[in-house]
Curated annotation (Swiss-Prot):
Function: Phosphatidylinositol 3,4,5-trisphosphate-dependent GTPase-activating protein that modulates actin cytoskeleton remodeling by regulating ARF and RHO family members. Is activated by phosphatidylinositol 3,4,5-trisphosphate (PtdIns(3,4,5)P3) binding. Can be activated by phosphatidylinositol 3,4-bisphosphate (PtdIns(3,4,5)P2) binding, albeit with lower efficiency. Acts on ARF6, RAC1, RHOA and CDC42. Plays a role in the internalization of anthrax toxin.
Zinc finger (C4-type): 504-527
Domain Rho-GAP: start-end pairs: 907-1088
Domain called Arf-GAP: residue spans: 480-611
Originating gene: ARAP3
Organism: Homo sapiens (Human)
Protein's recorded name: Arf-GAP with Rho-GAP domain, ANK repeat and PH domain-containing protein 3
Subunit details: Interacts (via SAM domain) with INPPL1/SHIP2.
The Ras-associating domain, residue ranges: 1117-1210
Record-listed Phosphotyrosine modification sites: Y1403, Y1408
Keywords for this protein: Cell membrane, Cell projection, Cytoplasm, Cytoskeleton, GTPase activation, Membrane, Metal-binding, Phosphoprotein, Repeat, Zinc, Zinc-finger
Length: 1544
């Protein structure tokens, strides 16, 4: 179309569906179509148009306007002939490339634009008349056939000879300098039915349009007609703009003679799709103009500013929760902003039609910069005339959805390539969204009930629809939109250039995007599924959009020339009218019709060469695999032979007689599609066996023969290269699994390079190759031969196994519960890829499993499964995969291969079994064990363990790290520390990387410490991810160790001297390495960017470990706790990690997920159990679990407290999970007793109680206006049940523990008890938001359950209050100092024999341990230190330890009246002393210890006040200096400068 000079740039670009670049043109001063003239490829690139197809469409539009403008009769330049360039300056001939839209013509310096010929528009250039299709062949005059044809000289394109109506042309140079003529005879062609227009291939391929034809009306005379057609074509484009949105339909120049005169005007727009059109769908990411941290006012109205990272890219203002978040929390488009204005206190307002956004900057200059930038963009927008507010787009689907992690429902709008989320439909109309999710690279996963997940590379979005049908509709629409982002319409546009191919050959649906290659038909998606059911021997189905890599130019040409109309004349020539298939047909009739049409051939006429239909199908399948595809297919599908007419053939490329195509000796172009990989060579083929075994032997009687193998339609094995008949063959459908055999232990006897094929029926055959290259080539070829296309790109080096698998996973929704999904598994390295493949069952979604990050690999025996087949269970974080093979033989092979790939065995850091944080499990396990049990051990990492045990433990970790469980009673701290140091020392490459050692030393030589630390950060950033994460974990652990230097005597200098030889793998005498490691430990906070919350968490865990002995803390800083389910039994116990931010709701969901418990009608509530089950407190879903557990250390018996999950009826506890509040206050008559007794006495009395707000009121009468007593509920705890010793009047009561008293309230029935309890809980947490039942927490995906793979610290959202409360608790514990008496230290030592070998001298200074470590009390006795160390109590369970020797004395001070039990001898190895001596010594120790504790308790009770009792401290009975437990007698060691000094 012609582009007027003043035509708006947006309207001009809309003609080619590229209006999204209008703002880009306007920003560069190109507001009209006339201003865009003169642009080229480079200029468009500089504008930011990166998509090649988009640039070509704009250039084509510019070229069209230039041609029509140059031929304008009002233009003087159009009347003058343009001089032809000299022969020596003629541009080079373009070389055609497959599926290239335009070929840029380069030449001497001219003013032409890319794609235009220098002779274009000259009067001396002419072209041949194009024959019009007509029903009967009419004789053409000799004058027309022999007329000289003038055109632009083009390079002959033999690939597209079927479209060349002239053949090769001989160029003849004329003496006139302004013309060049090329003449060639035009052979008479078989006319078509109007579906294909024979065009010049140069015109179609390069977009060059020849002008000026002898015998045709003059261009200037027909200008009015062309203009009318162009205007009508534009209107048609406007009407079909939405239907063709996204497709690059390149228009041909407005030459009316190119179009068939038999076509009507309304059909013109349908023929504008070129066979060589292109499609590009790329979104250009804008560069932010402004970005930074700002404070944003919360919309809740409580005047709270939230820290947000804000970006402005010229089109929209986005704010994020963090600068690393991929998705924003809100998007404000520029078109929705009315104005911006600044206000006081460094704030500025962004005003929209719906809301005013308030941001606060750090300075006035920053505020002015934001305001001026936004205001200038607003002015530019108004000058350019953008609508405000913007017109909402027409999305594919809209509706309200629930988003996990979002309080209210969101309004979702699905557009091509993007899913937009808005707060409401009004926000959608204004364009103010939450975030916009690009669908490229995403996947859709349907979950339970009404939920589905959208998996992006950065985050998982979990949605819940209103119903199951809406869920399916959303999932289908999203899946189609995701597939659309992967589509390439280049091949489809070419094939659709034939109008007959724009409708399905079977049902008539529009825009079919599939094709049956051997049948020559283009079909829709629904029919393609039925074609695939026919089998590859009948219909070979390929996608036009997804399988573009296998579409050769010859196949594309075949479909353009043939067309669905010609193919249907062959396949449905005898089909009665009205009996065809309709687009809305159901799968049943559709499949029956397609089977009758193609499998049986009921609707075609008899073929002259193949009377048998099965022979015809075999010939069609063979034709696409042989050379001369076009010739063979057109001969087989020759409908004219049935009608008694002369057969039609495409013209020959040399202009000879049609149908006489020369034979092409080259291999067929379509071999890569039908026969995916053709390969041949010699293989050592063993006979087929029914038993799995090693690779075939190379010598001896059982050595396999060397056969010539050819991989084509089947794997054929010949005796020699020249043998005519194969000895045996294998069909691709017979192969179940391909496996690369592991190298044998003795390569001399067997083939070191071999692979195996497991066949159907439980058979296996081995093949040996001559080398590694041959093995890789054969496995890749065979893998491509029998596997689906989705597996091909994954084949390559490192392939271990490939074959069919059945998959079942709770995360993948199947049509019915327990239904297995069919797919292909590909094992490569340590990754298992699951690919979708057609099969008898529903296809499995594509997925990937990192085997070295698995938590568990197990096999379920056939006796324990309902289908009586073995299942392989892969437990990953957050999900469990069940795999099943086709038979027992391939399942055994898969089990061995996956187990071997998931194991370790290597000495490289990357070869270890990893945790979720990419940290080797051995490092995580050792650090966790030392953190839990060794921080208080004096000389930790300095004292060595038994070398034999350390080597054995390291070998176990390398063999299978996830199966190693470090337990205090079985493993010793010294052995674990030796194992950790040995692991780092024996790595192939040190964790700090040997290639970066010079940079480490260079950084250590810098004079300033700040410079050194910054340089260390740079070097750490250069490390691989696994090295970087492992080093950070190790340094963080050493930082915690040196924080306890007052107890373990291990300062930073000592740790650096010990670990430098292992971390850097040096001799240990290098001063630089020791200095680097020492400064890394000291500067851990700054070097690794540890925030304040994490620092407080580290301090908290160190305080807990050093004060509370029975706590277990992993190196990640989370508390490891035991949670029971329904009953306090060992089998019902689950161990997991509890972070400071974990709520009771999240804990419940995690435990139920770990146990695989399905949600029912009952609610699961977490209870805090005290008094061995007498008191149960239901935790509010929003309560922090760790904050409650920290208070157990104040109990007389901390081991009596635990966590328990119980099912509660919905009617009793349902109100805890809703936001509904009671309209009237809770009031009722209860029987009450308080302790200590004051007003109510020591008996249960009936009183009226009123719950008002956050206070519990005691009323004299029900209608009393003034209460007698009032108790605030802040900090109160309500427990179900009353201690039995108080003899409650009813079994239904609850205990309210206040700050200085206990209140016991008895109810009439259980419902009343639950009503009061839940009302008190809701009153205490009335400011919390209502929770969602059985919804995963926001940190479920990032938090790992406790096993042998702990995680790095997980930072919560609001851990400040939790940490503050925990620190306050710890301060009180430090002041009281009672923990050391209640929790004796557990020590882990070797056996008696090993201690004799490695006996160390007794230290002169006392070894300070907690009270209960008996060596302190008998330091002056004659018993040796090594003997008394064996008597330390070792509880079996760290959290629920048994009664130790000091617990009878604790029961005396208990207020709960626990009975005393006689002391039991502690378990442990036998000592050298006699039993009588040891028994008398124990009795003496117990008596002395009890007298000391009782005397100290009486003394402190007499001196201290009742409100603030002081904690007892045990004096030294032997005259040693009194020492507070946990503190040394001398200050910790300090760093010494010389590196050669021994350890202090």
């Amino acid at each position: 179309m012609a582009a007027p000079q003043d035509l708006d740039i947006a309207v001009w670009l809309a003609t080619v569906h590229l209006e999204q670049y209008a703002d880009t043109f306007r920003r560069h001063g190109l507001a009209t179509a006339g201003a865009a003239r003169g642009l080229g490829h480079e200029e468009l690139k500089q504008l930011g148009i990166s998509a090649t197809g988009h640039r070509k469409r704009i250039l084509r539009l510019l070229q069209t306007g230039t041609e029509e403008g140059s031929l304008d009769p009002k233009s003087d330049s159009a009347m003058e002939p343009s001089p032809s360039p000299a022969p020596q300056a003629q541009p080079p001939k373009p070389v055609p490339k497959p599926r290239t839209v335009f070929g840029g013509l380069s030449g001497p310096a001219t003013t032409q634009r890319p794609g235009l010929s220098p002779a274009l528009g000259g009067p001396g250039v002419s072209r041949s008349p194009e024959p019009s299709p007509r029903p009967p062949p009419l004789p053409t005059s000799s004058s027309e056939q022999s007329s000289a044809l003038n055109t632009v000289e083009m390079m002959p394109n033999s690939i597209y000879f079927g479209l060349d109506s002239r053949g090769r042309a001989q160029a003849a140079q004329d003496k006139a300098p302004d013309s060049s003529q090329i003449s060639a005879p035009t052979p008479a062609l078989r006319p078509t039915t109007g579906t294909v227009h024979i065009m010049d291939p140069g015109c179609l391929y390069y977009g060059v349009q020849p002008v000026g034809t002898p015998g045709a009306p003059d261009r200037r005379e027909s200008r009015g007609v062309c203009q009318g057609r162009a205007e009508h074509r534009l209107s048609r484009q406007d009407l079909e703009a939405r239907e063709d949105a996204g497709y690059a339909s390149l228009e041909l120049p407005g030459d009316s003679t190119l179009l068939s005169p038999t076509l009507e005007t309304e059909e013109t727009s349908d023929d504008l799709i070129s066979p060589y059109a292109s499609f590009s769908f790329t979104a250009d990411r804008l560069t932010p103009l402004l970005s930074g941290w700002l404070d944003k006012l919360s919309p809740q109205g409580n005047y709270v500013f939230q820290r947000r990272f804000v970006q402005f890219n010229g089109r929209s203002l986005m704010y994020f929760g963090s600068d690393k978040d991929p998705f924003p929390k809100g998007v404000i488009p520029l078109t929705a902003i009315e104005m911006t204005r600044s206000s006081k206190d460094n704030k500025f307002q962004v005003i929209t039609g719906q809301r005013v956004f308030v941001f606060r900057t750090e300075s006035e200059a920053q505020r002015d910069m934001w305001c001026s930038t936004l205001q200038s963009c607003l002015k530019e927008q108004r000058l350019l005339g953008h609508p405000r507010p913007p017109q909402p787009p027409r999305p594919l689907r809209t509706g309200m959805l629930e988003l996990r992690g979002h309080k209210a429902k969101v309004f979702a709008a699905l557009s091509p390539g993007e899913l937009a989320l808005y707060k409401s439909e009004q926000a959608f109309s204004l364009g103010i969204g939450i975030c916009f999710i690009e669908l490229q690279g995403c996947s859709v996963r349907e979950t339970k009930s009404r939920s589905f997940d959208l998996l992006t590379p950065h985050r998982c979005f979990s949605f819940t629809a209103e119903s199951g049908g809406a869920r399916q509709s959303w999932a289908a629409a999203l899946q189609e939109a995701v597939t659309e982002t992967l589509s390439d319409y280049e091949v489809a546009e070419k094939i659709w250039s034939n109008r007959a191919n724009r409708q399905c050959a079977d049902c008539g649906s529009s825009r079919p995007d599939w094709a049956a290659v051997n049948l020559g038909v283009v079909i829709c998606k629904q029919c393609a599924g039925q074609h695939r059911a026919l089998g590859s021997g009948i219909s070979k189905v390929q996608s036009l959009k997804l399988d573009t890599s296998v579409w050769s130019n010859e196949i594309v040409q075949l479909f353009i020339v043939l067309g669905n109309d010609r193919a249907n004349r062959f396949w449905a020539g005898t089909l009665p009218p009205g009996e065809g298939l309709h687009p809305d047909a159901t799968p049943g009739p559709r499949g029956e019709f397609i089977s009758r049409k193609y499998r049986l051939g009921l609707f075609r006429k008899p073929h002259p060469q193949y009377p048998d239909h099965s022979q015809l199908l075999q010939a069609l399948c063979a034709a696409v695999a042989r050379p001369n595809l076009l010739k063979n297919m057109t001969q087989l599908l020759c409908v004219e032979a049935f009608e008694g007419e002369e057969p039609w053939f495409p013209p020959a490329p040399d202009g000879s007689c049609p149908g006489l195509l020369p034979s092409d000796p080259s291999p067929g172009v379509y071999n890569e599609v039908v026969v995916r990989a053709t390969y041949s060579g010699f293989l050592y083929c063993s006979p087929v066996s029914n038993k799995a075994g090693p690779s075939p032997p190379r010598r001896g009687r059982d050595a396999p023969p060397r056969l010539w193998c050819v991989l084509g339609a089947a794997l054929e094995m010949f005796a020699s290269e020249n043998s005519p008949e194969p000895l045996s063959l294998i069909q691709p459908q017979d192969i179940v699994c391909l496996g690369v055999s592991p190298p044998p232990t003795d390569p001399g006897d067997r083939f070191p390079f071999s692979f195996e094929l497991i066949l159907a029926g439980g058979r296996i055959q081995h093949f040996g190759t001559d080398g590694a290259d041959s093995l890789e080539a054969w496995t890749s070829a065979v893998g491509k031969w029998f596997s689906p296309l989705s597996c091909h790109q994954l084949l390559g080096p490192g392939l271990l196994r490939l074959g069919r698998l059945w998959l079942r996973s709770p995360s993948h929704t199947a049509p019915a519960p327990g239904l297995w999904l069919s797919g292909f598994g590909l094992l490569r390295g340590d990754h298992l890829f699951l690919c979708s493949a057609p099969g008898p069952g529903p296809p499995a979604p594509e997925d990937m499993v990192h085997l070295r990050r698995l938590q568990e690999i197990s096999v379920v025996s056939a006796a324990d499964t309902p289908d009586k087949k073995e299942h392989l269970v892969l437990v990953e974080t957050g999900r469990t995969l069940y795999l099943q093979g086709e038979g027992r033989l391939d399942f055994t092979a898969w089990n061995a291969a996956i187990g071997g790939a998931a194991g370790g065995g290597g000495t490289g850091l990357q070869e270890q079994q990893m945790s979720r944080g990419d940290i080797p499990i051995i490092v995580d396990a050792c650090i966790s064990f030392v953190t839990q049990h060794g921080l208080r051990l004096e000389g930790v990492y300095r004292k060595g363990g038994a070398r034999a045990r350390s080597l054995r433990l390291l070998a176990e970790f390398r063999r299978d790290a996830r199966s190693v469980k470090l337990r205090p009673g079985e493993h010793f701290v010294e052995d674990v520390t030796d194992t950790l140091k040995r692991f780092f020392r024996e790595l192939d490459d040190p964790v700090t990387s040997a290639r970066l050692l010079p940079r480490w030393r260079e950084a250590a030589e810098l004079p300033q410490k700040n410079q050194r630390l910054e340089k260390y950060k740079d070097v750490i950033g250069c490390l691989p991810r696994v090295n970087r994460r492992t080093l950070a974990t190790l340094i963080g652990h050493l930082y915690r160790v040196q924080k306890c230097a007052a107890l373990n005597q291990m300062c930073t200098r000592n740790l650096a001297l010990l670990f430098a030889p292992s971390v850097f793998q040096t001799d240990g005498r290098g001063e630089h390495e020791v200095r680097v490691l020492q400064e890394l430990i000291d500067g851990y906070i700054s070097v690794f960017d540890i925030d304040s919350d994490q620092v407080a968490q580290i301090d908290l865990e160190v305080s807990l470990i050093t004060t509370w002995k029975d706590v277990q803390l992993s190196q990640a800083g989370d508390l490891i706790m035991e949670v029971y389910i329904e009953q306090q039994l060992p089998d019902n116990c689950v161990t997991l990690k509890v972070s400071p931010t974990l709520t009771a709701e999240e804990l419940t969901n995690q435990v139920l997920e770990m146990r695989g418990t399905a949600a029912g009608m009952d609610l699961w509530v977490t209870f805090e159990i005290r008094e061995h089950g007498e008191l149960e407190r239901p935790l509010h879903p929003k309560e922090k679990v760790l904050e409650q557990a920290l208070q157990w250390c104040q109990l007389p018996e901390p081991c009596s407290a635990s966590l328990l999950l119980k099912k509660v009826p919905l009617a009793q506890a349902g109100c805890l999970f809703t936001g509904i509040r009671r309209e009237s206050p809770r009031v009722g008559l209860l029987r009450c007793r308080e302790e200590p007794p004051r007003l109510l006495g020591s008996r249960f009395q009936e009183r009226f109680f009123l719950l008002r707000g956050r206070c519990l009121l005691l009323l004299k009468e029900k209608k009393s206006s003034k209460p007698e007593r009032e108790w605030p509920l802040e900090g109160a705890k309500v427990y179900l049940g009353i201690r039995k010793k108080l003899k409650p009047p009813t079994p239904w009561g609850f205990t309210l523990i206040l700050e200085k008293m206990h209140l016991y309230l008895s109810c009439t029935d259980e419902d009343e008890m639950w009503d009061w309890t839940t009302s008190i809980l809701k009153a205490q947490h009335d400011d919390q938001q209502p929770v969602v039942l059985r919804r995963h927490s926001s940190s479920d995906l990032a938090r790992q359950k406790f096993g042998t793979m702990p995680l790095l610290p997980i930072r919560g959202d609001d851990s400040g209050a939790t940490l503050l409360s925990a620190n306050q608790t710890l301060r009180r514990l430090h002041n009281r100092r009672t923990l050391s008496m209640f929790f004796p230290m557990k020590s882990s030592q070797g056996s008696v024999e090993e201690q004799e070998e490695l006996e160390e001298p007794v230290y002169e200074e006392p070894v300070y341990e907690e009270v209960g470590a008996f060596p302190e009390l008998i330091q002056d006795t004659s018993t040796s230190f090594s003997t008394t160390r064996e008597w330390t109590v070792k509880p079996e369970n760290p959290l629920t330890s048994q009664k130790s020797l000091d617990q009878p004395f604790l029961s005396k001070s208990s207020t709960l009246g626990q009975e005393e039990r006689p002391p039991e001898p502690p378990p442990g190895p036998p000592s050298k002393s006699s039993p009588q001596a040891r028994g008398s010594l124990e009795e003496q120790l117990l008596q002395e210890l009890s007298s000391l504790i009782l005397r100290k308790g009486e003394t402190t009770a007499g001196l201290g006040s009742p409100s603030q009792p002081s904690s007892p401290q045990s004096p030294s009975p032997t005259g040693l200096p009194t020492q507070t437990p946990g503190f040394p007698t001398q200050p910790p060691c300090t760093s010494s400068p010389p590196s050669s000094q021994p350890l202090t």
